[in-house]
Amino acid sequence: MAFVAIEGIDGSGKSTVISLLEKKLPRVYATREPSSGPIGRLIKEWALKGGSVDPHVDALLFAADRIEHYKREIEPRVREGYIVISERYIESSIAYQGAAGVSREFVKYINSLVPKPDLTIILDVDPSIAEARIRQRGGAEKYEYLSFLRKVREIYLARAAEEGYPVIDASRRPEEVAADVAELIKRVVRFK
């Protein structure tokens, strides 16, 4: 039916919004990156150990996981008539690895084997709010530093402007954010 990517900095409410969308929309298949497949599990384990000293390695691992994730999980569910909603996709690599110094061209090239989603939505929140949410849920990972989140947010907003992605104010109540996202998805699904 349709493939939707929900993007945004850590602490922007992606997981919460997606779980609300599962209740609001019919035939939703929710997934996330890193995936639950072997490469995704490797990435999660790798991140716990501090990741690579070179962000290009992280970008390559995420791209490999994304290809596998798309082919094994996303594409088949779309063909089965689901609205597949992924928490993170290519824009996460552009934003996060970009903020770590990897060129946008490199990230796009290594992700060229997977298609763009039918709709990419950016959940935007001030990094200080995001950081407070992250601390509230129990800590921070490698990429979850305030100055880093600011860089990532800047890249997301620049990409939204370049690509015409809708940007949703995620500082509001999760139910309000989910209602706005659901309306955007309904518009895309209706015209497919």
UniProtKB/Swiss-Prot annotation:
- One BP annotation, GO: dUDP biosynthetic process
GO molecular function per UniProt: ATP binding; dTMP kinase activity
> Which cellular component terms (GO) are annotated to the entry?
cytoplasm
* Annotated transmembrane regions: none
Spell out the CDD domains in the cross-references: TMPK (cd01672)
The family annotation for this protein states: Belongs to the thymidylate kinase family.
Name of the protein this chain belongs to? Probable thymidylate kinase
Q: Which gene encodes it?
A: tmk
